[in-house]
């Protein structure tokens, strides 16, 4: 496999960007080697600058649920661009996308668009604090809610790969208001609320953790968190930046039957362009400026191109589209388990809908501690052999892989064939 041009570009990039990248996980620090520089994407495939062709399971970390350069998405974005990229004023496309979101999730009474998932979660936290007049927030170990200061505490994702449970630059006086507990441990949450429930403004959670690898909520866990929030007057915030419109038409909230006070979105809702959103109960959202005193604003919020891409993408996500995703994702997960067993490599394949992770672990993985027991060395060996076999996986043991509606049976078969040699390589570690 040729990598000469990627290597040259990476050397140049390191003179321009910290670590040579504009987001840490892209640097391949979790697996070693040189990151591939991508020239273009089409459907379920990526093509790097050296001419290598990969079946893509990163999908820009989730947003490309209908694949790369889908003609209908491209057409709607191009139409929007002809009208103007951004106005700094309301536009009809904001209403068009918001109505489609509420059609899929009718319990969202009001929403606000912004420009990233981080912006959405940071704003939701501010709204919860302002609404409740409380300062403390509760999050869970390994759950990543963006790079906002209050949320970079035991945040998983690239922070986990770097071995940094917190980030330098986050003041202790700020971090002290962020309480953390293990994911999937409802009894621990009950004890914390009994001790200091009156100070907790909100509980925020990834309903399906994606940034510690895929972690699946235990039966009744999300419902139990919601009940505790109701009992103690805290708001329940579900971070659907990754799961929203991916694991089902109604997101994880629809899949697991929970109705939070606030929900945050990103990724799929923008169809590959920068976007975020938060919304929920009208009485809470009506406290947001200019309707209320809690300030939130953004120059590019609701920009027409992102609204167009999101609208086109959600429109394409029909019942048949979700059925295809479920069928192919199940085939991939089952096939990976079978091939790992044949190679005598212990793995745990965690999956919810079209997001999954292969953990190189002997025991079930259900929280941050059990995820950390996975072998990153084995994953690294597996990753590089898969890359050579034409499958582009997330370059970290602690990230989710994704499928799109553009993936085919042939893509999955090719990937499973490549995994036979990859598991054999991992078995040597």
UniProtKB/Swiss-Prot annotation:
It catalyses: (S)-4-amino-5-oxopentanoate = 5-aminolevulinate. GO terms for cellular component: cytoplasm. Keywords: Cytoplasm, Isomerase, Porphyrin biosynthesis, Pyridoxal phosphate. It is found in: Cytoplasm. It comes from the Bacteria. Pfam families: Aminotran_3. PROSITE patterns: AA_TRANSFER_CLASS_3. Its cofactor is pyridoxal 5'-phosphate. One of its GO terms (biological process) is protoporphyrinogen IX biosynthetic process. Pathway: Porphyrin-containing compound metabolism; protoporphyrin-IX biosynthesis; 5-aminolevulinate from L-glutamyl-tRNA(Glu): step 2/2. Its main location: cytoplasm. SUPFAM superfamilies: PLP-dependent transferases (SSF53383). GO terms for molecular function: glutamate-1-semialdehyde 2,1-aminomutase activity; pyridoxal phosphate binding; transaminase activity. The modification N6-(pyridoxal phosphate)lysine is found at residue 267. Its EC number is 5.4.3.8. Homodimer. Belongs to the class-III pyridoxal-phosphate-dependent aminotransferase family. HemL subfamily. This is Glutamate-1-semialdehyde 2,1-aminomutase. It comes from Anaeromyxobacter sp. (strain Fw109-5).
């Amino acid at each position: 496999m040729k990598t000469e041009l990627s290597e040259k570009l990476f050397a140049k990039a390191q003179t321009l960007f910290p670590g040579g990248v504009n987001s840490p996980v892209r640097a391949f620090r979790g697996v070693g080697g040189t990151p591939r520089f991508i020239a273009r994407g089409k459907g379920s495939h990526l093509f790097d600058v050296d001419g290598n062709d990969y079946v893509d399971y990163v999908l820009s970390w989730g947003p490309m649920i209908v694949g790369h350069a889908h003609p209908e998405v491209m057409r709607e974005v191009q139409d929007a661009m002809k009208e103007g990229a951004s106005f700094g004023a309301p536009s009809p496309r904001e209403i068009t996308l918001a109505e489609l979101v509420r059609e899929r999730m009718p319990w969202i009474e009001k929403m606000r668009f912004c420009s990233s998932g981080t912006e959405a979660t940071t704003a939701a936290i501010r709204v919860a604090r302002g609404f409740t007049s409380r300062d403390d927030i509760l999050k869970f170990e390994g759950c990543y809610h963006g790079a906002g200061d209050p949320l970079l505490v035991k945040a998983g994702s690239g922070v986990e790969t770097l071995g940094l449970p917190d980030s330098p630059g986050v003041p202790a006086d700020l971090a002290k208001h962020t309480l953390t507990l293990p994911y999937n441990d409802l009894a621990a949450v009950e004890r914390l609320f009994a001790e200091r429930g009156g100070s907790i403004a909100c509980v925020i959670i990834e309903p399906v953790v994606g940034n510690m690898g895929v972690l699946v909520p235990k039966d009744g866990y999300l419902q139990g968190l919601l009940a505790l929030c109701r009992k103690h007057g805290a708001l329940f915030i579900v971070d659907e930046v990754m799961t929203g419109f991916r694991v089902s038409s109604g997101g994880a909230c629809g899949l697991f039957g929970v109705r939070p006070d606030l929900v945050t979105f990103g990724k799929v809702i923008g169809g590959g362009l920068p976007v975020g959103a938060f919304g929920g109960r009208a009485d809470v959202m009506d406290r947001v400026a200019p309707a209320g005193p809690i300030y939130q604003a953004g120059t590019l919020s609701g920009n027409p191109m992102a609204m167009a891409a999101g609208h086109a993408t959600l429109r394409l996500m029909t019942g048949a589209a979700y059925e295809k995703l479920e069928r192919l994702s199940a085939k991939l997960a089952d096939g990976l388990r079978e091939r790992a067993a044949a190679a005598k490599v212990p793995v745990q394949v965690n999956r919810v809908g079209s997001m999954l992770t292969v953990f190189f672990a002997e025991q079930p993985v259900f929280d941050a501690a059990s995820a950390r027991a996975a072998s990153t060395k084995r994953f690294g060996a597996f990753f590089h052999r898969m890359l050579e076999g034409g499958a582009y996986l997330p370059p970290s043991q602690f990230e989710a892989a994704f499928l799109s509606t553009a993936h085919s049976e042939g893509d999955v078969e090719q990937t499973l064939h490549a995994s036979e040699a990859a598991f054999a390589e991992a078995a040597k570690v």
